[in-house]
Amino acid sequence: MFNCFLLNNESIIFTIMKSEEDFVETHLKEVEGASIWESPSNIALVKYWGKYGTQYPQNPSLSFTLSKCITKTSISFAPKEIKNRDFSFDFKFEGNNSPAFHPKIQTFLERIDCYVPFVRQHHLKIESVNSFPHSSGIASSASAMSALALGIMSM
């Protein structure tokens, strides 16, 4: 599908609607590498009260980006030694092994698997640090998942 729009009688903006297949990596490659990404956090002024479905909020919320409060996530990756369909990763938060975060990371990887199937072929070493205190009311999981997503897309 192809659309064009007239903006202020001066500029034309073109958009091309793509199908889901356009986003799926079909050339599976086993490589080694690393990436580092930073993502800003946010703080809610009007908080949402729960979710339904696949991460849809029950009600609207209002939040502000805190550009100085960042999560920095590094991902190093290499082909897995044992070939199987399981995700393979280690996670450190603030320099410490943090298995409590594994279920959230596992769920995230399962949700994006159809778009980045090559991730299953690699072992990931994920390390994350915040420039702000954890559990302080600042949305650290949002910035952490953003930085993780950017890192995976850089593989």
Locate predicted features.
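Active-site nucleophile and cofactor-binding loops and adjacent substrate-binding regions
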Residues: 138-140
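Short amphipathic alpha-helical face segments that pack within enzyme cores
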Residues: 143-151
